[in-house]
Amino acid sequence: MVLELHIWGPAFSLPSIDPQCLATIAYFSAVVPRDAWVLVASSDVSVSRTNELPAVKDGSRWVSKFRNIVNYLREYSNGQWDLDAHLSGLEKADNIAFSTFTESNGQLLIDLYLYVTSQNYYAATSPAYGAILAWPNQWITPVKTRNAAKRRTDHLGLSSLDLEATEEQRERERLSATAAGQIPQSLLYRPRETVTTLLGKTAQASRFRLESLTAELFEPLQELLGKKSYMLSDTQPSSLDALVIGYLSLALVPEVPSPWLRDALLTKTPLLAKYVERMRQQYLGVVSAADAFSQTPGGKLPWRPPESVTVGKIGNTLFNTLADATPIWSEIRKRERLRDPAFQPSKAPSHNLLLTAAAIVAGTTAAVSYFFYPGLLKSLPLGSADAKQKEEEKQRDEVMDLGSAQDLLSVL
């Protein structure tokens, strides 16, 4: 039986926009025979019970996350598809330690580089998602992914890379100071700072912290690599090599307006950068979004086109978005996903059928409402429109009265 590897789709001439997906692709390319697997750019987390990609489908069974997939391949092949089989005891310890180190530190840097940094997100990352996603995911997924990246990196104190958040914070501070009477009237309406000014201040404030973060990841990896061909051996790669390729390819390859991560990799650790480029060419190749959707497979990777988007899938997406945005419901769903990472649909409880039906109904209703809501507004009776207009005028008058009262109090 052929294994199906489902991933987030191609971006930046790489086969995936996600580092874990890239690492898994590199692992498959290095150890699994080409005729034993296919690569599917489903770009849809709902294919996996844990709501995660990458995910491997073996018949009715799904396995997600890089490390789980590596372990599954070892068991599936009776040890034949194991990149770490040749490692000594000490090398296995280094493999575990540096793999954890690469995943944790690499994820934070990719979050900052492609998602938190405003120029890179809007100029490169968001359009890349638009090229691989269908409606409504192309509007939901990029924002959701960026918000998650902001939460993961919030403790680093580098929110100034997000120019929107920086400007919003400045505006809130200005309004608070105005309300408290701390700013003279002559300074209340000074011109807003331009993007260029903000970029200058952001770069200056964040430079030293970013240099520290990049050095913490790149320098130990280059020291471990040394003059060897691979991270832990001079003869063959390991699962650590796959992870390093996955994360550092997204640091080296994307063309972005603010390439601070690529510059750090090239200038601080040039040997590591050459290694990443060599391994990328060997195991990932150069890919376009069209390759993933082509009906005629070709190239370095065994692509298979994903299934077409159906009304049921759209409904399921809208249903999941609504469910994950509901506090109590979202927590219940998370616990259910964590309960069985290697989920088998054939053993699923029967109530999942009801949830699927509810997803289709709810999603279809939401889609219909989305398309027809403007028309419903236009068809309101004239009396209703007049009442709405009068209510809005009343609210504006109340706001004006409140402003006048504040002015009077300031004079007193």
Mark where each language-model region is.
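Juxtamembrane amphipathic/hinge helix adjacent to a transmembrane helix
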Residues: 266, 273-346
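GST-like domain detector, emphasizing the conserved glutathione-binding G-site
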Residues: 2-155, 162, 311, 315-412
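GST-like fold's C-terminal all-alpha helical module
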Residues: 116-271, 276, 330-333, 337-364, ...
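Alpha-helical recognition domains of nuclear gene-regulatory proteins
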Residues: 27, 72, 98-101, 217-220, ...
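Short amphipathic alpha-helical interaction elements and helix-loop-helix interfaces
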Residues: 34, 75, 79, 224-227, ...
